[in-house]
Amino acid sequence: MKSSRQNRGMALLIVLVIIALLSTLLTELAFSTLVDLRLTETFRDTTRAYYLAKGGVNAGRMIIQEDRNGYDSLDEPWSQGVVNYPVGEGAISVRITDQNGKLGINAMVNRDTPSALMIDRFYRLMLALEIDKWGDPAELTAALIDWIDEGESPYPMILTEGLDIPVAGAEATYYQSLTQPYLVKNGRVETLEELALIKGFTPEILRRVLPHVALHEEVKVNINTASSAVLMSLDPEIDEDVADILIDYRKEAPIKRLEQLEEVLPEAAYIALKTLGNLEQLDLRSNFYQIEADAVVNDGRRRLVAQVNKKNNKLTFFKVD
């Protein structure tokens, strides 16, 4: 009898252990199923957000293509954008910015030959942004040239406004000597974030510089969309006061003819632009635009950044965040 009770007790214990194990397994399975379902929903919504953002990019391209007048300015439909526009279960924000109102840093070197005009402009941009509080504008300019050009010798001299400024650029030797060495690019800058790899371009400097530079290789600057700092980079005679005059003028109406500058600018500034040939390097239209599309669908989020060439409607840059 005693043995029989012991056997029944042991059987009951085994059953309880099995039930406990099954309960644990079922609980874990239920939790895992919920997690998988949640992950599936998030993946689904993120995918939907991606395609919603992609639709925003395509809509931006269409808006840019519809703009066919003889000038591009900040009062046109493409510059207005949309914020949190509801679409089905989600919402989208689209922002379009002109890139020809910025300095094209890849134009600083043309087929491995540094461009004196663009080097001068970039150096003056550094001065306009008061970068000298955080770094040496001439050294930064030289480091950027060395990052782009294919030569192995550091750029030796910045020539600007009649001054010869000795500099020590940065080629392979510098980057290989770092604690965590890497290769110098010796080629075109592909993303603006890449500038963080270049000697001297600290986060503080980049915060000030990035809004005023672009990846394109065009020399001409759209004066209808250029910032005060970019306008000041165009010629030594364009100081902050002259730049403000130009910006105030275009707020009333976009500049539609370069000849209008003679009416707008002080005589010395206009003559300097015309005499030095800088007037020919200005434009009233833009070829390159950046489209930023942010989409949200429930818990799914996607951000796309694209740059488009207006001439052929082709993307020159595309990034998914």
Residue ranges and their predicted role:
Residues 2-321:
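Compositionally biased linear targeting/interaction segments
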